[in-house]
Amino acid sequence: MKAIHWTIAATAFAFVQPTLASAATTDPEVIIYRFNGVRGLLGSAAPGTVFHCTNFSGANEMIRFVSRTQSGEIAGNHVLPISHLQTVTIVYGNIITYSVDLHLTLPSALTFQGSIAIAATSANMFCTAMVMETAEFAPVGIALRGIRFNPVPGSQE
């Protein structure tokens, strides 16, 4: 009798398929990074800023970029969907080094210098940022240090 029960249990386990986590695009947003030293001048060869973010949450998520001027006024608020294990590239300025998923826009054509907050529907993402020369095919620039908020549980950053 035990052999029959074990056979049934083994058969049941053989047909169970692993599934990805359900989409979390409706979860509340949490701030995951803040970067200062963000710079951009649209329509110019002046240095711009590029952000790369990767989602490893196991679900589709939403990522938001809220930029502020030197004086603290909101200069932009942009949202982008991001799939599991997808890397997105977001830029201020005319960066040609990378293919771009989202060009951040400014309310005017003035030089933008300030900070940006990155929020997402999951903390299971990581982002980097660089101020780069805009007319270069090779990445020429400096890395910006991001302050991490809401770290991934069980990680050290």
What are these regions (language model features)?
Residues 1-8:
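Bacterial N-terminal signal peptides that target proteins for export
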Residues 9-12, 152:
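Enrichment for repetitive, rod-forming helical segments
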Residues 13-21:
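C-terminal segment of classical bacterial N-terminal signal peptides
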Residues 20-157:
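Gly/Pro-rich, tryptophan- and cysteine-flecked surface segments typical
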